């Protein structure tokens, strides 16, 4: 009876309560941000709702009939389901739910639901799949699970089947088109710096080259049909994801545009280009997708055509971006640079892993009497100093006292939190990220009652936190904390330093483990650009802080799924930090709807904040890089 009641409550939570809360959140956000671009059309929304409902109903039926269970992570089916809808599409229930919510927001004319809630839902669902469900399925049913047809093709030399080619359209081109049109509409009213060089402004467009520019659409769209092996098609899909994600990030982060140069159409080709100009936006130009995609497609076409022909055509298409006046030289070179980077993605990742492993085994310490100075303290000291410098630049020169209150509260919170959660006889002075966040929030609350600037400090520290945490992860690498669990050799790094926690506490010396601190560094770099862009746009500080809390929580949830620290507390199938990440998502959602001031303009670069940032950085260096290894007193030892 208790099990049945638990299943009913679980189902109600996700089938009723969650959609209702998302609708209420969208309603509150609409009241807070009335200027969001409105999208409302039942002709577009109803088909999405119906498609989503059909996916959910069919997938639920397949789970019940074939798996002997219902779609509940806490109560998984008895058997793995790889037939029916699950034989074609990965995670059809999540896809269906995303369709229903997006379609519902469109029908109800909730712009915040479209622009904020839906992207958060998609990111959160991805975090759940990557950080929990994917791993749980392997634990339950083994690693050799059947692959849905509309998924990444296997890396084998056999020719692609028709569904492998179809997967490229479902997994890459479809999501890309939705993301591009959405971002283009979101940025259409923005202003930014032009990327044209002075010399380009006098160049007259060449009308006949519109054929090359327009031909790029067919060249790219037909490319999956030219793939000669499943492995090359798999690489095309993966590199399309990575390159598109990076370019979309650039669109959102960098205020750059390329307004098309004047073009006097004299024939149907010219009128076709003018139609494209009307529908597009100058903000979606740097780096140029019109360069990235033709070169990526040329890699597939090179299996059917001579390489010189394939890449030669891609080069002409890239040149047409300039000759038609649609892009600047900078846009074109940046787009080609993205292609070069993703084309060497495997080599670049291996090089990054090698460098990460060097840092992970770079422990050095020096003794001065009973005092030990460890080199990893320099990373976190620099992180603290750099973070406070950024906070000082964002808030202005008159807030030094308030900044130090929040900084000290964050440092003490990190220490107290870790003492409560992770302290052991061999680890008497740990520090914890979430404790630092809680302490910083307490400091911002103190500042609010003291000077009324709590929101300003809350937003500024949120905007600087990715920098602080990202740099601080270098200390994690050297010390061996926040490490991953064992993994295949090609995916990870090895720790060999005897004093590293990986060797001393987890006893995985020489074993390959996931480079989870590296994942965190990359994730924080992505988040840093987004929150700083919100600040420069003068966004409400609650939105800045909320975006950081939600994005960092989703990143941490995914990262935690691959971590392997033995002292981490787990319950309910999740690590405690994953539960905390869920709470931080809720906190971020609340922060976004609270009333508060907007981010002030960033003042010119100043070095005055270094007067307090550097001393605080030295204090953090001492707290996290200097210890007394021969003492058994509390707080004496870092390792």
Question: Language-model segments: which ranges?
Answer:
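N-terminal signal-anchor transmembrane alpha helix
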Residues: 14, 18, 42-55, 159-185, ...
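Alpha-helical transmembrane segments of multi-pass membrane proteins
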Residues: 18-28, 173-192, 383-390, 592
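Membrane-interfacial alpha-helical segments at the cytosolic side of multi-pass membrane proteins
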Residues: 96-108, 222-225, 291-310, 337-346, ...
């Amino acid at each position: 009876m208790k099990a049945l009641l638990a299943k009913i409550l679980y189902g109600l939570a996700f089938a009723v309560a969650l959609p209702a809360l998302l609708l209420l959140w969208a309603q509150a956000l609409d009241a807070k941000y009335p200027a969001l671009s409105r999208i409302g059309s039942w002709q577009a929304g109803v088909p999405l709702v119906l498609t989503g409902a059909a996916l959910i109903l069919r997938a639920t039926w397949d789970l019940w009939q074939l798996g002997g269970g219902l779609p509940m992570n806490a109560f998984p089916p008895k058997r793995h389901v790889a037939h029916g809808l699950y034989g074609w599409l990965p995670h059809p229930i999540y896809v269906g739910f995303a369709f229903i919510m997006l379609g519902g927001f469109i029908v109800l004319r909730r712009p915040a639901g479209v622009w904020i809630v839906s992207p958060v839902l998609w990111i959160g669902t991805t975090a759940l799949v990557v950080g929990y469900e994917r791993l749980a399925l392997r634990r339950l049913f083994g690693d050799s699970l059947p692959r849905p047809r509309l998924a990444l093709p296997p890396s084998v030399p056999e020719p692609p089947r028709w569904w492998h080619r179809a997967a490229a359209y479902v997994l890459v081109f479809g999501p890309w088109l939705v993301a591009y049109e959405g971002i283009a509409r979101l940025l259409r009213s923005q202003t930014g710096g032009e990327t044209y060089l002075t010399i380009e402004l006098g160049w007259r467009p060449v009308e006949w080259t519109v054929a090359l520019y327009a031909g790029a659409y067919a060249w790219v769209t037909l490319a999956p049909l030219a793939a000669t092996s499943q492995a090359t098609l798999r690489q095309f899909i993966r590199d399309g994801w990575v390159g598109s994600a990076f370019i979309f990030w650039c669109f959102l982060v960098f205020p750059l545009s390329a307004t098309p140069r004047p073009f006097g159409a004299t024939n149907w080709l010219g009128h076709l280009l003018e139609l494209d100009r009307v529908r597009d936006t100058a903000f979606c130009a740097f780096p140029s997708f019109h360069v990235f995609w033709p070169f990526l497609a040329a890699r597939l076409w090179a299996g059917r055509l001579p390489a010189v022909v394939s890449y030669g055509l891609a080069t002409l298409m890239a040149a047409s971006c300039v000759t038609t006046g649609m892009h600047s030289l900078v846009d074109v070179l940046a787009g080609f640079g993205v292609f070069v980077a993703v084309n060497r993605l495997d080599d670049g990742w291996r090089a990054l892993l090698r460098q990460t492993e060097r840092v992970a085994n770079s422990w050095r310490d020096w003794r001065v009497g009973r005092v030990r100075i460890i080199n990893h303290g320099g990373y976190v000291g620099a992180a603290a100093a750099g973070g406070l410098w950024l906070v000082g630049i964002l808030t202005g020169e008159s807030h030094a006292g308030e900044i130090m209150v929040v900084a000290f509260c964050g440092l003490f919170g990190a220490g107290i939190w870790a003492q409560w959660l992770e302290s052991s006889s061999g680890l008497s002075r740990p520090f914890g990220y979430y404790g630092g966040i809680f302490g910083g929030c307490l400091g911002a609350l103190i500042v609010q009652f003291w000077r009324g600037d709590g929101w300003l400090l809350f937003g500024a520290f949120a905007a600087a936190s990715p920098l602080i945490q990202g740099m601080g992860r270098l200390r994690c690498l050297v010390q061996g904390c926040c490490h991953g669990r064992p993994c295949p050799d090609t995916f990870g790094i090895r720790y060999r330093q005897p004093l590293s926690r990986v060797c001393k506490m987890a006893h995985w010396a020489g074993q390959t483990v996931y480079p989870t601190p590296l994942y965190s560094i990359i994730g924080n770099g992505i988040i840093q650009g987004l929150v700083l862009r919100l600040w420069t746009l003068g966004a409400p500080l609650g939105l800045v802080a909320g975006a950081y809390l939600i994005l960092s929580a989703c990143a941490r949830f995914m990262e935690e799924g691959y971590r392997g620290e033995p002292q981490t507390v787990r319950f309910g199938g999740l690590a405690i930090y994953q539960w905390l990440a869920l709470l931080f998502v809720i906190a971020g959602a609340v922060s976004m709807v609270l009333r508060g001031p907007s981010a002030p303009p960033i003042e010119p670069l100043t070095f005055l904040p270094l007067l307090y940032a550097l001393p605080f950085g030295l204090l953090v260096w001492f707290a996290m890089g200097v210890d007394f290894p021969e003492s058994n007193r509390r707080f004496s030892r870092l390792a």
